[in-house]
Amino acid sequence: LVASELLSMPQMVRQMVLEGVDALITNVPGVCIGVSTADCIPIILYDAEHRATAAIHAGWRGTVKRIAQNTIAQMRTAFGTNPQSLRAIIGPGISLHNFEVGNEVYEAFANAAFPMQEIAQRQEKWHINLPLCNQMQLQEAGVKAENIHATDICTYERCNDFFSARRLGINSGRIFTGVTIS
């Protein structure tokens, strides 16, 4: 939760507090929250009724741990958010075609009860549809399908426009996806 107390901390302290955080929620006007990605899936949530937002970094590990659903639960607790009234944007990230994974990642999704016949595809190796996994999570949490906008932009395929750690290397740049309440 990004509250005014966090904003009053020295920058170095704020950096330590936020290190490794994959989701932020706030209802503080004028504060931009966001996540940096380079193939992982950025998700923005907006609750117009309670003027609250969330920014989520959904890598495969966070997706397996259901970070989108957990963030919605946090918004519900902190702000009284009704998931049915949320608006969601699933930003640019790696696509099913390009997200090749090992058996251990496939098994992690299977063990987390994801519908493997819908989200996975066997080519030479397994491929996982990370954007779809997160869209399913949003819907399972109560977000209406018509309130979810997926950009359907693959960072791996469009690495000239968007950063891709898989294609350009781990030291590639990062995409910052942010949201501010005015």
Kindly label every feature range from the protein language model.
Residues L1-S182:
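Active-site microenvironment for binding and transforming phosphate-containing groups
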